């Protein structure tokens, strides 16, 4: 990945629960936050009856906006599965970034050293118990990021 382009790889897992083989077209399209198409990849494969298979689509995004805690840019990936005249659409948000851990420089995010400030949280939510609702974790993490500039978390147990 460079400032000029970022290669992407999307692995699509397909399941065929029918009694016949299906020729499926898998289309992955990537949109920026304005809705502009910035990447696309298409492939076809036969999914055997009562089996699963993986389809790998690859492509390139020109001049990518990189995700970081300070600039959490998210692209929208839409996956279209089509078989004969029927189709299914799946949508998700993704960020583009590089990261690595270096023995001398520490954590490197998008080529820049970053300090991981974090907390250790118990697995439960007090009176709510151990089955903590998603909303509680969301509220906790937003509060930690805003008030204490934390960007990492370790859970106990």
Regions found by a protein language model. Give the residues of each.
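Secreted/periplasmic carbohydrate-active enzymes, especially glycoside hydrolases
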Residues: 1-156
């Amino acid at each position: 990945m460079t400032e000029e382009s970022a290669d992407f790889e999307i692995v699509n897992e397909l399941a065929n629960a029918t009694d016949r083989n299906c020729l499926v077209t898998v289309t992955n399209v990537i949109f920026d936050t304005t809705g502009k198409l910035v990447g696309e990849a298409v492939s076809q494969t036969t999914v055997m009856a009562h089996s699963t298979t993986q389809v790998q689509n690859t492509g390139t995004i020109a001049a990518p906006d990189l995700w970081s805690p300070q600039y959490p840019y998210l692209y929208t990936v839409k996956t279209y599965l089509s078989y004969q005249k029927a189709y299914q659409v799946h949508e998700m948000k993704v960020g583009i970034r590089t990261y690595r851990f270096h023995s001398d420089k520490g954590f490197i995010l998008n080529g820049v050293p970053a300090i991981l400030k974090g907390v250790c949280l118990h697995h439960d939510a007090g009176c709510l118990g151990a089955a903590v609702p998603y909303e509680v974790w969301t509220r906790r993490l937003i509060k930690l990021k805003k008030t204490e500039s934390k960007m990492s978390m370790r859970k106990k147990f």
